[in-house]
Amino acid sequence: MLASQYAQSMKQKNFFLLPNSVFELNLNKYEFYIYAYLIRIEDRRTYQCIVSYPTIAEAVGFAVNTVAKYVRTLEERGLIRTERTEFVTKDGRKRNGCLRYHILPFRQALDRHRERQLAELELATARQRAKAK
């Protein structure tokens, strides 16, 4: 019974996967919700999605400014990369479009996080040694 329910869910694509190690990154709730939403709507073949701040804000229940702030922190952490898009109106003028989000390989972000933690630990150890002298 359970296997058939799983197979049915797979056909409906009513779910998405997040790596378990996402919890190692110590994302705050804003970063987590936004990252999870971007994973949910990404094109699984290209690892990209195009969505506006207001759309994300409505989906996760945060203010637009909060979404913009934490999208930047997700970029700094190496989880996503954003790219501006443009479109041409009917009268021929170029306008800014929504951001295109590139979901970056999770392993790289996790490795970067661990390297940062190791560097902080080494710095703290060096400070303790200097204090002891």
Where are these regions (language model features)?
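Short acidic DE-rich linear segments
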Residues: A132-K133
